[in-house]
Amino acid sequence: MLIIETLPLLRQHIRRLRQEGKRIALVPTMGNLHDGHMKLVDEARARADVVVVSIFVNPMQFDRADDLARYPRTLQEDCEKLKKRHVDFVFSPVPSDIYPQGTEGATYVDVPGISTMLEGASRPGHFRGVSTIVSKLFNLVQPDIACFGEKDFQQLALIRKMVADMGYDIEIVGVPIVRAKDGLALSSRNGYLTADQRKIAPGLCKVMNAMAEQLKAKELTTEEIVALAEQELNDKGLRADDIQIRDADTLLELSATSKRAVILVAAWLGQARLIDNKVVELAE
């Protein structure tokens, strides 16, 4: 496994791989890797000749400086995990290589509509930062496929739209959420939880699953389901932040023609903002 830190060296290897006709898979990450990331790597490994994992804590997608500063940087441990998964290249650039003039005046990629709804409404600029760094990585790595986790449901939808709109010839692979035995979705931010908070955290998944059953039963309105979920989260010791039930294919409000719904939940627990989602098939 080769660790690449500079753009010229990355371009040199990508040029060679392209000349050799290799199929390249990209797994973009911000590091602090866990089993959920490893699932992405395994999926990439099964689909391509060469796997490139990027590790870059992207300053453009953080809406708070303190959140950026405390995001865990664990490059050495991450590389050890990736080596065991037979990753070919780790691309770990410094911010000045990605944003030579800083992030304030940098050229950016914005995906209208989807960037400012839902999570985007509560985190201004976040999705613009995501689409910009992913676009940069696509241009640098030139992958045939790229793997993203379904835990970040809106992010995956945003990337699919960006790829379609920009004409990228890249297959986007969504990989199912990896959960702990108690149902908590794996996340780098789970590391912010204390031992006591970790015991409370699975309540988010339990409330979400209850919402799914209520939605299938069709006995309550979506507004009633959301209100009950907010109360239940608060009763369990979490602080409800944003709970939505949307059309899974458009992320718009549910309509009579919606075939699938997605439940999107976000709640605070101590210093950690936990998110999760669940897709529900709607009966005819």
Swiss-Prot record:
Protein name: Pantothenate synthetase
Protein residues bound to (R)-pantoate: Q61, Q155
Catalytic residues, chain numbering: H37 (proton donor)
Function noted in UniProt: Catalyzes the condensation of pantoate with beta-alanine in an ATP-dependent reaction via a pantoyl-adenylate intermediate.
Residues holding ATP: 30-37, 149-152, 178, 186-189
PANTHER family in alphabetical order: CYTIDYLATE KINASE/PANTOATE-BETA-ALANINE LIGASE, PANTOATE--BETA-ALANINE LIGASE
UniProt-annotated location(s): Cytoplasm
